[in-house]
Amino acid sequence: MRRTIAVRTMTEPETFPRNAFWETRAFALAMIALAAIPLLFTPIPPLTDLMGHMGRYRVQLEIGSSPYLSHYYRFDWALIGNLGVDLLVELLGPILGLEPAVHLIVMAIPCIMVAGLLLLAREIHGRVPPTAIFALPLAYGYPFQFGFINFALAMGLMLIAFAFWLRMARLGKLKWRPHIFFVVSFLLWVAHTFAWGTLGLLCFIAEVVRRRKEGKPWFESGWRAVVACLPLAPPALLLMPWRGGSSPKGTFDWFNWYFKWIWLRSVLRERIELWDRLSALLLYAIALSGLLWKPWRRYEPVLGIGALLLVIVFVCLPRVLLSSAYADMRLVPTMLAILILALRPIGGRRLSISIAIAATLFFVARIAITTLAFQKFERNYDTQLQALEHIPMGARVMALTNTPCRSAWYSSRMEHLSSMATVRKQAFVNDQWEAPGAQLLRIAYPPAGRYYSHDPSQIVRRPDCRARNEPILEIALEYFPRDAYDYVWMIDMPRNRWPVDADFEPVWTGNRYGILYKIRHHAPQPGPVMGQNGAAGR
């Protein structure tokens, strides 16, 4: 039986030392375990949007049994390409509880990404180049830190799937590959559409390169690659019914070079600006180092061409695509990681060992700083969340969160901390997203009005740097529908901005930052009817 030629460029023997420490299974497992450490001791992972997702998960899990949540929200299951973590929460939430389940799932995402990067590097080169270790910190890239957990999970799984695609070709097991990847393509599409599209792009390139290595002409290589990738195509049929009813306004802000530049330099954005920028600069320097001398020899063609096409996709993508914000930003860590993985090793044993040690120390340093940063975020969360002790079940909470300007590198990551009132108290909070076609939750509480019922009505920045759809504090306090809410929760708000209002009764203060007010009402309110035992009745 004829064996298929591998898509792989083996490295010269003298380039790699035998039994190199970074190629052992123990090293790979250590790197995967290391990726979990920053999230190990943070019960609420400090990712900007995550708490908002957790509020949605609470509605998802309990809307059928909670009179509070069913009064404020609607949740209808549908097949959309953005459900990776949602489905895992549906599986694990009833077993572990919502918060432990989310903690476990989110902690696994960087581990999956690191595993995918190492597997792909080994499969594409035959052995793990020492430079590949420099890609590992991108498991904590800005999209993950922002809380795009469905996207991050799906991209990690995509890397593993692509490595498996290459492995099956190398081993000549092409008979079963279409059947396996027919299923894989649907799973990836459901996890996140971007991952499915990226897998298709990389698999097509791999098939073209493989045919060219077999001596086939370009045209034949191209159409054979199309045929090989057809099992990945069926999820495209789901795009029409999924997005068919979306508003045309769901895609906009094309070729915004200002933001694209910000995304490039923010690839490792976390807390300490100088450290994060220097780290990003180092990764870009390593990724582009292959251009200095015979780039056609320094870059492995499958990943090199793949990274180039992802750069083109990044340039062409709008900032908001089909109601999904920051569409272009999400690709930056992936395209940078793939370009780093594309580098073929050069030099002798001593240089390879030196690069591997330097890369490992860099990853350890990034993990250490991230761990300390996450601990600081967690302590700040704990201080503000003390207010929840004074909020009853099913309350209606108007959140106003003090938020730094977008230009500030450091962010408190509290934009959606108020959703913990939904998670722990089944409360209505004005911080959920309205994104038809992108998620399944709907706000069904008309008394809150069109603006003060959803994100970003909770985000309060300085007037000179706020977005046009974000509130001005004084105006929000004056005009939000007071009869629709029971509490005003001013998260991380400095004392000099606390209002003095006859209708606001302070019930908790966080020393210098944060205050919770109970609203004094003068008429019956439209919330759930309370029984004598405090339980809500229908």
Question: Model-found features: residue ranges?
Answer:
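Signature aromatic-anchored transmembrane alpha helix within multi-pass, membrane-resident enzymes
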Residues: 283, 341, 345-370
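Short hydrophobic/aromatic helix or loop-helix immediately within or flanking a transmembrane segment
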Residues: 55-62, 73-98
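Short periplasmic/luminal acceptor-recognition loop of GT-C membrane glycosyltransferases, typified by
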Residues: 377, 387-472, 477-493
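Hydrophobic alpha-helical transmembrane segments in integral membrane proteins
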Residues: 364-388
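Hydrophobic/aromatic-rich transmembrane helices and adjacent perimembrane loops
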Residues: 322-349
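Membrane-embedded helix bundles of polyisoprenyl
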Residues: 31-37, 111-124, 129-169, 177-207, ...
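Aromatic/acidic, Gly/Pro-rich catalytic loop(s) in extracytoplasmic/lumenal soluble domains
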Residues: 461-538
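Transmembrane catalytic cores of multi-pass membrane glycosyltransferases
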Residues: 42-53, 64-66, 73, 81-82, ...
